[in-house]
Amino acid sequence: LPLDRCFEVDALALWIPHGADQPITPDELAKALTASGESLRPGDALLVGTGWDVHWDQPDFVTHPPYFTAAAIDWVLEHEVALLGSDTPRYDSPHNPQNFFPKFFQHDILLLAPVVNLAQVRRPRGKLTALPLAIKGACASPVRALWIEE
């Protein structure tokens, strides 16, 4: 993985509070973007905070998180982001599958999950660094994500 894809990437953080099994929709993404007062530029990393990270130690953390609808993923793809991160441990619903991953991965977008402490982001625009471990042949890795506010 080239470092420029995960080191000091221009990033935007959006806040969309959600509870268990609630879908994240394109309308909510658009409203959160407008509320941020920022624009989402091609190549940006997009972080979506729902507040779900506070459920880290709860039995439903992995089984009932908020999830992205297929239309929300289409919205993300239309904005040509380089990385999508969220405080949910999974992007699709195990109870209402959206089946967007084949289309999503055709766009070579990195996924970052679960991100914690997005509620502490004070400004929506920043730089994201999320360096993976150098594991040969791996398709995933833990990272320590750092947010630097502009």
PLM region spans:
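Active-/binding-site microenvironments in catalytic and ligand-binding cores
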Residues: 1-150
